[in-house]
Amino acid sequence: LVEKYEIFKRYPSSLEIKIYKTKFLAYVKKDGENFLLGSNNKFILTKNIIEKIPLIHGNFRSDDFKNLKNLIDETNFNFKEIKNLYFFPSGRWDIETYSGTLIKLPKNKLKENIELSEIILTDNRFKNINLIDLRQENQIVMNEQ
């Protein structure tokens, strides 16, 4: 599957074509079928399972996910550690990691809250945390196993 392509005309009579393959970023279940969401922002029907990409739950637009993914990429949060993403009608996201931690993000100030959750997750004092709730401004709720 193609994310983008470039065509250059080389004079006098040749073309140089570059094709960039799309990367699969997440799984989505819609109407009982499995789709892959590509870096080209398109849904691709699939029957194959690819390990280590998150499953997205909820009714979201591909732009909603793209915005979240771009914010995660701007931080030190490791996208490959995300097992599930939950999108809510209010427009906010929850992140579940492979280590079993659920991060409840607010609708606003996503980038700084993603950075804060990464700091908490990498601090050994909080290694048994299974819930980080950042929905309330100036307040963090954490729960240990």
What are these regions (language model features)?
Residues 3-145:
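Charged, solvent-exposed interaction patches on well-folded alpha/beta domains
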